[in-house]
Curated annotation (Swiss-Prot):
Residues 359-370, 387-397, 1168-1178 have a biased composition (Polar residues). The keyword Kinase does not apply. This is Zinc finger protein 521. The record marks 72-73 as: Breakpoint for translocation to form PAX5-ZNF521. There is a cross-link at residue 1146 (Glycyl lysine isopeptide (Lys-Gly) (interchain with G-Cter in SUMO2)). GO terms for biological process: neuron fate commitment; regulation of transcription by RNA polymerase II. Interacts with EBF1. Interacts with SMAD1 and SMAD4. Predominantly expressed in hematopoietic cells. Present in organs and tissues that contain stem and progenitor cells, myeloid and/or lymphoid: placenta, spleen, lymph nodes, thymus, bone marrow and fetal liver. Within the hematopoietic system, it is abundant in CD34(+) cells but undetectable in mature peripheral blood leukocytes, and its levels rapidly decrease during the differentiation of CD34(+) cells in response to hemopoietins. Residues 1-37, 81-108, 349-397, 863-882, 1168-1188 are annotated as: Disordered.
């Protein structure tokens, strides 16, 4: 059981009720001292305030103190306080009843009532003990969300739970610097640190036990007060004698009585005695020391009541009361024993307040701020008032219903009488200067407050008020600086201090200097000395009749008065006055003491000396009719003039004041002012700076700008809410919405995953279906294709299937690739208009050597030939196919080195190097299950066989002519067919402006001159036949068709109008048309006939010298002279320009063409015996724009737009770009990088058409494309440098798109 009894808490409704004397539940009092001092202090200070260190005896008191009274506590959570926490988290947890042990206990009344001071914060129930309340709160589990994992205790806050867990884990990070003790909480460490402090100022007067606070001592004194009961005093004293508290704490010596123990401590252990620095209350009979007056009085009544009847131990004089005895003892005190000065202060005598003698006054004046007073002069003591003593005076002071008095040095101690207060002051505060107690009626100096009180009762209360007024000196004091007249010196001093305190800067501290002869006040020391020297040089002996007025030795006194206290204390320095105001008037600014002194002096307390004098003046007026005035004349002390009336004398004094008083000048600008108020306003202007601030209406903070104020409002006065998008509920914190999401919207759902393919399913049925279709039906097929996911039973089938994913047959006309040769053949027939001849039977045995040779030549041509050069041949996207390739026989993959091919076969097909027989065997097994009945080819799938059968049946015709309804296999053939429906074939003139068109270039240029023919929905219209075309290619076909008919018009007319149009033949490589089939070289491969022009054949020869034209093949050719003449004739008739057969570049004259051939194509110049090939005269699709036909430079760099003569120069130029700038080309608009300028240009084209629905329109001819690279190819082929729209302002470069210009400017010209 703990030594500290659980005190019964006070009622919450009556906080001022006293504690009951009876103990609760029969708990016995136990004053046994605990062996561990640290545990004792922890037990005592368990109800201590952490902010102000004040100790309380119950939980309700400290709770009320923290909420309402403590100034150092700002929003403290009561639950976080150690005194309000759970029993396990408190140092005195052993005093509480654990909830686990109180399950069967009776809580008593659970509904609220006057006797149950502990209400529940969650419901309406209340309890009589804190332990019952704590146990009950555990039942509110919905209000206490945090649970201890060790003991399952519930908490309201997480911090309380974490603090409680430290008691289980033993986490003690707060270590004592004096010893090895460690604690888990900082407040426990603070309580422990008090054990190391040896200063315990509060000691029990009975058992001499020390305490750290007055509240702990007060709680301890309740134990001794209960021992004073008559029926229990004997037994309690006997019980106390049996306790261990009678042992000395230093030497363990035992004593029978506490008085003996106290004497022992005072004699043998003076360092532990309470009179180390001050004396205690001492008994006049046995000289025993006491701290409390109640202990002293009880001691004298119980011990010395029968020995002596209040007689003096020095002179044997007897008194009726103890107060008179102690008052008499003051007369035996020697002046040498008092530690004070012998120089009295005149002003101090006048300012001692009479209000201090009233019972209701509180002597709360700091003695350190008092002026030192003179020792009291022995006076004849007044007569005794035995008849006036009441019966209550003889009883103990502790039982009298008297008002209490407080000490001016230790405000917490209370005294029932002035006599005991005087004993306390002389015994406990000898080091403090003694006050002078002055009677305001007769100015008699009394040594103590008790003597002053007795003097007032005996002398001035027995007289008639009229006599008191007549006994007062009839003297009137006049102010030397104005016409104010007062009745006493105190009022005059108050008037000068308040009204004339700031006469000049030298007297700023309210210094007042009074003459000791005439009591005239001066503002400076020099003016006072001059007054004494001139006026009182022979009048040094003239004084008033009062004995006090003859004692001063120092003529100059500086005084400072507090205008906020009721008793108007005075001070001898400004520092002491400031200290007094800071300690006793915290809520009043110090500056108000000087600024508003004049105003506050008018509203003094009724108990102040000035108010008393004013009251006396009113009494005199009531008795005598008017205050007494000095008889005789008014003499001026400056010039000696005499006046019979006061008004004339005051008028005369004003003339002296104007010359004597210093002028009020500004210290900054030396400007003069008539009064102090105007001077103060003017000086304030020098020190004032007007600034504008923006003030927050909520917290009154100031800001210099509106932005700072708005930022403050957003940060401090804006509430951030969190809304759940699922249920639209609003929360005030992030933690709350996280908890809401975790509770309301976190539903568990099972996901079923297949362990074989890692697919997830929401229900088990879907998983079963997946296993049935994908794993049960294909158990035998373990080989799976990585491209399409199809499974096969053997590895051979998988390898055969993989070949379908490789496109090794490439079409060099349009750069498309195909898996099989039959698909390539089909593409050539439908898209590129091969010769319309029947396919020979695939089943024929053998082939002539000539056919095989042509087949090899065509295969080489398809793989190595390139398109004719145009303006964009110098781009980095051209593929170099001259390097030999090594192909895989199984999947068709090609590699540049044989070792790479071997690694591929080993890695992908498990074929080691040298296993040729195995390869053949595998090749034999690679046969499909689907066989063609026509050519006996096998296929692996039905779709492949169906596509193959279509090649035997003919091409599929999907495109229908809207005029005649005929179907065609490709859009190109449909376009050529639609041209035949035109009726304006012979004119070749524009049907809008009737302008004759002579060439394809003129036709295309003229179409751009009629923008009204463009339609965004249907496309263009031909200016000759007015048919609608949907693309630029179709328009070019129209131009070729119309211009071709125009050039052949004369020949047709000579043969007759009934003759049909001659059939044209196209080259399979460059798509040029020729009138005769003999102009083409015929090649036959796999039963498909192909025709190449002479230029394409020469180009293939230059690329592959081993390829020759088959012997017997009809090679058309003419002599050089004949060719030149023919060309010249053509130029005259048709106006056509010559074109180079190798590079397809046109020239104005034949000489330029020959010069070009000699310089550029020197290796292709034929011998003299050979004949010059005929250059085709008609081209359906010109490779360069008309603007580029006049230029000789045909190669242009995309990066810097430089133009070169041949391919070699531009390749070197591009290589230099790559060396200098690298392969990374960055787009400055989106920071993406590309490895070539062509890709960057295509990317910039996409930037230009962002948000256009995926369409790309040519900025020159307005052709629409669905891919950016197609538009780029169109610009390269159809438009030249002159067609570029956007010019750079800082360099000569031009661009087709604005995004190209922006990227160029940011890259090249940005600073």
């Amino acid at each position: 059981m703990s030594r500290r009894k659980q005190a019964k808490p006070r009622s919450l409704k009556d906080p001022n009720c006293k504690l009951e004397d009876k103990t609760e539940d029969g708990e016995a009092l136990d004053c046994k001292k605990r062996p561990e001092d640290g545990e004792e202090l922890e037990d005592e200070a368990v109800h201590s305030c952490d902010s102000c260190l004040q100790v309380f005896e119950s939980l309700s008191d400290i709770t009320e103190h923290k909420i309402n009274q403590c100034q150092l506590t700002d929003g403290v959570d009561v639950e976080d306080d150690p005194t309000c926490s759970w029993p396990a988290s408190s140092p005195s947890s052993k005093d509480q009843t654990s909830p686990s042990h109180g399950e069967g206990c009776d809580f008593g009344e659970e509904e609220g009532g006057p006797g149950l001071p502990y209400p529940c914060q969650f419901c309406d129930k209340s309890f009589s003990r804190l332990s019952y309340l704590k146990h009950h709160e555990q039942s509110h589990s919905d209000k206490l969300p945090f649970k201890c994992t060790y003991c399952s205790r519930l908490f309201k806050h997480k911090r309380s739970r974490d603090r409680h867990i430290k008691l289980h884990t033993g986490d003690k990070k707060y270590h004592c610097s004096e010893c090895d003790a460690a604690f888990s909480r900082s407040d426990h460490l603070k309580i422990h640190l008090k054990t190391h402090t040896s200063n315990k100022p509060y000691k029990c007067a009975i058992c001499r036990r020390g305490f750290l606070s007055s509240s702990s001592l007060h709680g301890h004194m309740q134990v001794h007060e209960r021992n004073k009961d008559g029926s229990q005093s004997g037994s309690r004293m006997e019980d106390w004698k049996m306790k261990d508290t009678q042992k000395c704490s230093q030497c363990e010596e035992g004593f029978d009585f506490p008085e003996d123990l106290q004497k022992h401590i005072a004699e043998c252990h003076p360092e532990c005695s309470p009179n180390e620095d001050r004396a205690a209350l001492q008994c006049v009979y046995c000289h025993e020391l006491f701290v409390e007056e109640t202990s002293l009085m009880n001691h004298m009544e119980q011990v010395h009541s029968g020995e002596k009847k209040n007689s003096c131990s020095i002179c044997s004089e007897s008194f009726h009361t103890v107060e008179e005895l102690y008052s008499h003892m003051d007369s035996h005190q020697q002046p040498e024993s008092c530690n004070h000065s012998n120089s009295p202060s005149l002003v101090t005598v006048g300012y001692t307040s009479v209000s201090s003698t009233t019972p209701d006054s509180n002597l709360s004046v700091d003695s350190s701020t008092m002026v030192e007073a003179a020792p009291p002069i022995p006076k004849s003591r007044g007569r005794k008032r035995a008849a006036q003593q009441t019966p209550d005076m003889t009883g103990p002071s502790s039982k009298q219903a008297k008002v209490t008095y407080s000490c001016i040095y230790c405000n917490k101690q209370l005294f029932s009488s002035l006599a005991v207060l005087q004993i306390h002051l002389k015994t406990m505060h000898l080091d403090k200067p003694e006050q002078a107690h002055i009677c305001q009626y007769c100015l008699e100096v009394l040594p103590s407050l008790y003597n002053l009180n007795e003097h007032l009762k005996q002398v001035h209360e027995a007289q008639d008020p009229g006599l008191i007024v007549s006994a007062m000196p009839a003297i009137v004091y006049q102010c030397n600086f104005c016409s104010e007249v007062v009745n006493d010196l105190n009022t005059l001093q108050e008037h000068i201090r308040c009204s004339h305190g700031f006469a000049n800067p030298a007297a700023k501290d309210s210094n007042a200097f009074f003459c000791p002869h005439c009591y005239m006040g001066f503002l400076t020391d020099s003016s006072l000395e001059e007054h004494i020297r001139q006026v009182h040089c022979d009048l040094s002996g003239s004084r008033f009749g009062s004995p006090v007025l003859g004692t001063p030795k120092e003529p100059v006194v500086e005084v400072y008065s507090c205008s906020y206290c009721t008793n108007s204390p005075i001070f001898n320095s400004v520092l002491k006055l400031n200290k007094h105001i800071k300690e006793n008037h915290k809520n009043i600014p110090l500056a108000l003491n000087y600024i508003h002194n004049g105003k506050k002096s008018r509203a003094l307390s009724p108990l102040s000396p000035v108010a008393i004098e004013q009251t006396s003046l009113k009494m005199m007026q009531a008795v005598g009719g008017a205050p007494a005035r000095p008889t005789g004349e008014y003499i001026c002390n400056q010039c000696g003039a005499k006046y019979t009336s006061l008004d004339s004398f005051q008028t005369h004094l004003k003339t002296h004041l104007d010359t004597v008083l210093p002028k009020l000048t500004c210290p900054q600008c030396n400007k003069e002012f008539p009064n102090q108020e105007s001077l103060l306003k003017h000086v304030t202007i020098h020190f004032m700076i007007t600034s504008t601030y923006y003030i927050c209406e909520s917290c009154d903070k100031q800001f210099t700008s509106v932005d700072d104020l708005q930022k403050h409002l957003l940060d401090m006065h804006t509430f951030v809410f969190f809304r759940c998008t699922l249920c639209q509920e609003v929360f005030d914190s992030k933690v709350s919405i996280q908890l809401h999401l975790a509770v309301k919207h976190s539903n568990e759902k099972k996901v079923y995953r297949c362990t074989s393919c890692n697919w997830d399913f929401r229900n088990e049925t879907d998983l079963q279906l997946h296993v049935k279709h994908n794993h049960l039906e294909n158990q035998g097929k373990v080989h799976k294709c990585i491209f399409c996911g199809e499974s096969f039973g053997t590895e051979v089938e998988l390898q055969c299937h993989i070949t379908t994913h490789s496109k090794k047959y490439n079409c060099k006309f349009c750069s498309k690739a195909f898996h099989a040769i039959i698909l390539l053949e089909k593409h050539l027939r439908e898209k590129h208009c091969v010769f319309e001849t029947k396919t020979p039977n695939c089943g024929t045995n053998g082939a002539s050597e000539q056919v095989q040779k042509e087949e090899v030549e065509l295969q080489t041509l398809l793989t190595n030939s390139q398109e004719s050069h145009n303006s964009h041949d110098g781009s980095e996207e051209d593929v170099d196919t001259s390097e030999p390739m090594y192909g895989c026989d199984i999947c068709g993959a090609a590699y540049t080195m044989e070792t790479l091919l071997q690694n591929h076969q080993l890695r992908d097909h498990n074929i080691r190097p040298g296993e040729s027989a195995i390869v053949k065997k595998k090749a034999e097994l690679i046969k499909g299950n689907y066989k063609c009945n026509v050519c006996s080819r096998t296929f692996f799938s039905e779709n492949g066989l169906r596509e193959h059968m279509q090649t035997h049946l003919g091409p599929v015709k999907h495109y229908m002519c809207p005029i005649c309804g005929e179907r065609f296999p490709s859009l190109l053939t449909l376009t050529e067919h639609k041209v035949t429906h035109s009726k304006s074939l012979d004119t070749g003139n524009c049907r809008i402006c009737k302008m004759p068109l002579q060439s394809e270039e003129e036709f295309l240029e003229h179409c751009q001159m009629h923008p009204d023919l463009r339609n965004s929905l249907t496309g263009f219209r031909c200016v000759v036949c007015m048919q609608t075309v949907t693309s630029t290619l179709e328009l070019k076909i129209h131009g070729t068709f119309h211009m071709q008919k125009t050039g052949n018009g004369s020949a047709v007319q000579t043969t007759g109008r009934g003759q049909h149009v001659q059939k044209l033949y196209k080259c399979a490589s460059c798509l040029k048309e020729f009138r005769s089939k003999q102009d083409l070289v015929k090649l036959d491969i796999n039963g498909l006939p192909y025709g190449l022009c002479a230029g394409c054949v020469n180009l293939s020869k230059s690329a592959s010298p081993g390829i020759n034209v088959p012997p017997g093949t009809n090679r058309p050719g003419l002599g050089q002279n004949e060719n030149l003449s023919a060309i010249e004739g053509k130029g005259k008739v048709g106006g056509l320009k010559t074109r180079c057969s190798s590079c397809n570049v046109k020239f104005e004259s034949e000489s330029e063409l020959q010069n070009h051939i000699q310089t550029i194509h020197r290796e292709l110049v034929p011998d003299s015996n050979s004949t010059q090939l005929k250059t085709p005269q008609v081209s359906p699709m010109p490779r360069i724009s008309p603007s580029q036909s006049d230029e000789k430079k045909t190669y242009q760099c995309i990066k810097c737009q430089m133009v070169f003569y041949n391919e070699w120069d531009i390749q070197v130029h591009v290589a230099n770009h790559m060396i200098d700038e690298g392969l990374n080309h960055e787009c400055k608009l989106c920071s993406q990088t590309f490895d070539s300028p062509a890709k960057l240009q295509c990317h910039l084209i996409e930037h230009s058409f962002e948000g256009m629905g995926g369409t790309f329109k040519c900025p020159v001819c307005f052709t629409v494309f669905v891919q950016a690279n197609k538009l780029q190819q169109h610009i390269f082929s159809a438009h030249g440098q002159e067609d570029k729209i956007y010019d750079c302002t800082q360099c000569p470069q031009k661009f087709f798109f604005q995004t190209e210009l922006q990227n160029h400017t940011m890259t090249q010209h940005s600073s």
